[in-house]
């Protein structure tokens, strides 16, 4: 056997198992495609068809089946895709569905919706309150819902003094306190008109003090009775307002500093022959004088020994007060003091040394001088003289307050003011004293 033939035999032997498997697979496929009756009919008709034609038909059928399967697979995919789209279209929002509406529908119904919106806006503006002071926005962001701020009680035409009388001063307050807390706390004793918490100018933190003003003055003592009660865990202190005293102190301070404006001085212990022109010549070098009034007796026209001088500038009046108080004029030391007008219409006179005005031209002034000299020398005056000096001081106070003029008090009146004692009193004589007639 030749080598070529041997190779062919070996190759056929190696391919034989594979050919058997292919033949068996082809038979199985033919059996599946053709049922038993078909196979029997074909066997009866004879062996007219060849094996090659049978294999070709089988391959065609395979290709048709694969095409059908791929087509079915595509159809199923398209069905799944359509089902997914339909499901998503159902879950879409109504707003997105409205986008697919036709333009004709929008043109037809757009004007109606716009007119409806305009009517709704007009209705809302009509119902909503107008923007004005006293309203503030609440927690809602809508401008149609506003929270009214607490309405402050209307203020009558009250003077500052009357408002101060209805105000209390609160101390020792908690740092986190608010005006609403104080209003709720004091509303138990009366209607609160205003609350002011004093805060630091730089840090804006509360200083722990506040002013509370009531509508009725009867609520002030009740509010003061709340002292010691705890507000936000801290015992509160309530006092009457010191605003009037603070105002007067500020006015006096302004006068001392010389902040513009007129100032009135009292000039006393004058000789009876001193005239207004003499006083003007003495006081005018210190500044411009607006008015000089020398008090005189209405019957005799004689000077009473005191008067009032008004300077146009308080600084000039202050210098005159410092320089001329105690200045000796016609043998008498002048008494110069500052005049303060009181709310009741009276006047208060204060001197730099704190002494009261002594008028040596009257009996009361001489009594007071005697008491002052005796006190400085350590001599005890008799009880009658001490009582007379006290009565003279009382009369001088009445005269300074404007209640009773000192000239209207005669010695009999001074005697009536002193207590009547039936005991003998000690007396002493003073000699070498000047008299008004010898001046």
From Swiss-Prot:
Transcription regulation as UniProt keyword: yes
What keywords does the record list, in alphabetical order?
mRNA processing, mRNA splicing, Nucleus, Phosphoprotein, Repeat, RNA-binding, Transcription, Transcription regulation, Ubl conjugation
What SUPFAM superfamilies does this protein's entry cite? RNA-binding domain, RBD (SSF54928)
Q: What InterPro entries does UniProt report for this protein, alphabetically? A: Nucleotide-bd_a/b_plait_sf, RBD_domain_sf, RBM39_linker, RBM39_SF, RRM_dom
Pfam families per the record?
Answer: RBM39linker, RRM_1
Q: Where in the cell is it found?
A: Nucleus
The name under which this protein is listed is Probable RNA-binding protein 23
Q: Basic residues bias: where?
A: 60-90
What GO terms describe the biological role, i.e. biological process, of this protein?
A: mRNA processing; positive regulation of DNA-templated transcription; regulation of mRNA splicing, via spliceosome; RNA splicing
Chain intervals for the UniProt region annotation (Disordered): 13-159
Entry-linked PROSITE patterns = RRM
Q: Which GO terms describe its molecular function?
A: RNA binding; U1 snRNP binding
Regions of compositional bias (Low complexity) in chain numbering = 36-57
Record organism: Homo sapiens (Human)
Q: Which Gene3D superfamilies match?
A: 3.30.70.330
- NCBIfam families this protein is in? SF-CC1 (TIGR01622)
Basic and acidic residues bias (residue ranges): 17-34, 103-125, 144-159
């Amino acid at each position: 056997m030749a080598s070529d033939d041997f190779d062919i035999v070996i190759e056929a032997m190696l391919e034989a198992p594979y050919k058997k498997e292919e033949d068996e697979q082809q038979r199985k496929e033919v059996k599946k495609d053709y049922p038993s009756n078909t196979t029997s009919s074909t066997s009866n008709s004879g062996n007219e068809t060849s094996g090659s034609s049978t294999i070709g038909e089988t391959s065609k059928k395979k290709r048709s089946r694969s095409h059908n399967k791929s087509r079915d697979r595509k159809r199923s995919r398209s069905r799944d895709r359509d089902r997914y789209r339909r499901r998503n279209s159902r879950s879409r929002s109504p707003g997105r569905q409205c986008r697919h509406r036709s333009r004709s529908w929008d043109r037809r119904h757009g004007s109606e919706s716009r007119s409806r919106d305009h009517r709704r806006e007009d209705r809302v503006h009509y119902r909503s309150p107008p923007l004005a002071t006293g309203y503030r926005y609440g927690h809602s962001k809508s401008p149609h819902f506003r929270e009214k701020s607490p309405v402050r009680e209307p203020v009558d035409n009250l003077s500052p003094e009357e408002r101060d009388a209805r105000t209390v001063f609160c101390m020792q307050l908690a740092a986190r306190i608010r005006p609403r807390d104080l209003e709720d706390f004091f509303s138990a004793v009366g209607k609160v008109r205003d609350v002011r918490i004093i805060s630091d100018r730089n840090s804006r933190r509360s200083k722990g003090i506040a002013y509370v003003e009531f509508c009725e003055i009867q609520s002030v003592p009740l509010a003061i009775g709340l002292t010691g009660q705890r507000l936000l865990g801290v015992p509160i202190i309530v006092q009457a307002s010191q605003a009037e005293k603070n105002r007067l102190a500020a006015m006096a301070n302004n006068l001392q500093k010389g902040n513009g404006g007129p100032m009135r001085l009292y000039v006393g212990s004058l000789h009876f022959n001193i005239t207004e022109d003499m006083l003007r010549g003495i006081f005018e070098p210190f500044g411009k004088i607006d008015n000089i009034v020398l008090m005189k007796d209405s019957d005799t026209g004689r000077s009473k020994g005191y008067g009032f001088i008004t300077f146009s500038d308080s600084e000039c009046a202050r210098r005159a007060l410092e320089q001329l108080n105690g200045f000796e004029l016609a043998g008498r030391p002048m008494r110069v003091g500052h005049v303060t007008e009181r709310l009741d219409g009276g006047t208060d006179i204060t001197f730099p040394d704190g002494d009261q005005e002594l008028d040596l031209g009257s009996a009361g002034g001489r009594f007071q001088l005697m008491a002052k000299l005796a006190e400085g020398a350590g001599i005890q005056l008799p009880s009658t003289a001490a009582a007379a000096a006290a009565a003279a001081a009382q009369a001088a106070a009445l005269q300074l307050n404007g209640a009773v003029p000192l000239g209207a008090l005669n010695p009999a009146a001074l005697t009536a003011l002193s207590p009547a004692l039936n005991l003998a009193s000690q007396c002493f004589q003073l000699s070498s004293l000047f008299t008004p007639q010898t001046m």
